[in-house]
């Protein structure tokens, strides 16, 4: 009940912001972005918080409203929170600085068919790393030497056939596990992750 109460409260507050934009006359020249940095397990997988790499915690909403944004399109594609900045620059007609490594979501918004990321990655402290290609997700767990928490294991999920991530295929789908582990290793090397050789 508390969780649904939070949703209702948030919905009301977002409504107040949108109404204030309407009253101010600025609604038509304001970009509104609704997103989150994480979800909550709320009991799924026996977890309550956000400290995991399952879809209920890492797959977050992203709704954009404003001039130049198609109002009738929903897109199911891999993206990163970092992609919001160059997207807003494009929509506002501002040049994206060369130092920005993320990608604009505008091609996805316009066609709904573009692919910006073949894979996305995430991490939690020194105990979890994740790579996902949209269908297959590999989660690698580590034992933290500092806090002496965590465990060493790998999970692999086929999100197309198991969206709730209940059937670990890491020992039955070795080809996908090896492919994704290689991609994860390359990403960890690129970002200088100290757990690469752990």
What function would you assign to each model-found segment?
Residues 1-30:
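A long, amphipathic alpha-helix that forms part
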Residues 3-6, 10, 80, 84, ...:
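Long, internal low-complexity/basic segments
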Residues 19-70, 80, 129:
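Histidine-centered active-site microenvironments of extracellular/periplasmic hydrolases
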Residues 27-30, 68, 72-131, 178-182, ...:
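Polar, surface-exposed loop/tail segments
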Residues 41, 53, 62, 74, ...:
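Conserved beta-strand positions that form and line the central face of beta-propeller blades
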Residues 44, 64, 107, 132-133, ...:
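Conserved hydrophobic "DFG−1" position in protein kinase catalytic cores
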Residues 55-57, 122-171, 176-179, 198:
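C-terminal, low-complexity/hydrophilic appendages and adjacent surface loops
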